[in-house]
């Protein structure tokens, strides 16, 4: 049920410019979703609180995690991700739509942490995935060994799920790999 709500909520967010009631519907869903996801001390979110969260910078955000980024990392740990896939890449950064979408993506990232569902979000929104080499204590990033990105406007073929072996054996062309 929560997965269906996320899909519906994303649709409401993308229709905010066309439908004046979409904002209220999206906020209602986000609050219901968040109340079920975060039980301790949950406070109802408003459009203003979501925009404030999405436009603030979080210099100490990486301290919340075991791993830490290094000076050679192109990014610091941040709850917001750059969206490269259309139509999400055309949203005004820090605007109501982009802010609410970032909040929804953050909640989905939290909910689906160990379920493998994040891969579909990284593909859908064109979020860059970095692969890191960590030091001996597994806390500090030594270097980035690879990244899967749609930044240049072309979808990275490694994001596509490969077809099953029996389907390929039957003659269907497999999805390309890099």
Residue ranges and their predicted role:
Residues 1-4, 8-178:
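Acidic/polar-rich alpha-helix caps and helix-coil junctions
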